[in-house]
């Protein structure tokens, strides 16, 4: 089978959780985005930021990226701490964390919030992109989360 884009569980030694991992799924046959699930139960005080590791990595083509947003059903209580998550294709299987996707969530509700294990917390959609003629680099990614230019 020719792989184009999709999701896999990260290798065991790079996992951050111990429970069962649910790969992202589309809510319907025509949905644009894929739901990401919480691997653990979480509590967060008002204005607290939590990092939810998914233990999932995404593979895609050279001219694609995966963009993450908080699910609309969580929008009144949570936001992504960096407002949007951008996953480059070279994040997949990087040597630092095997491409483990982490989601920073900030509690914006003004009261303590709870996330259940298995709850859908974010959505990711694959996008094609263009590169500028004079903006390319030969730098190869070696790090994981937040490692570009480090």
Where are these regions (language model features)?
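DUTPase catalytic domain/fold
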Residues: 1-150
């Amino acid at each position: 089978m020719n792989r184009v884009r999709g999701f896999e569980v990260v290798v065991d030694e790079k996992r951050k959780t111990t429970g069962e991992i649910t790969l992202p799924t589309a809510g319907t046959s025509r949905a644009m985005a894929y739901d990401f699930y919480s691997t653990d139960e979480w509590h967060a005080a008002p204005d607290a930021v939590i990092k939810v590791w998914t233990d999932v990595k995404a593979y895609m083509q050279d001219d694609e990226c995966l963009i993450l947003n908080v699910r609309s059903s969580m929008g009144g209580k949570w936001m992504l701490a960096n407002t949007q998550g951008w996953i480059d294709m070279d994040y997949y299987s990087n040597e630092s964390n095997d491409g483990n996707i982490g989601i920073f969530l900030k509690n914006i509700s003004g009261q303590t919030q709870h996330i259940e294990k298995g709850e859908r917390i974010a959505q990711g959609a694959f996008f094609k992109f263009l590169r500028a003629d004079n903006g390319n680099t030969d730098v190869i990614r070696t790090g994981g989360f937040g490692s570009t230019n480090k």
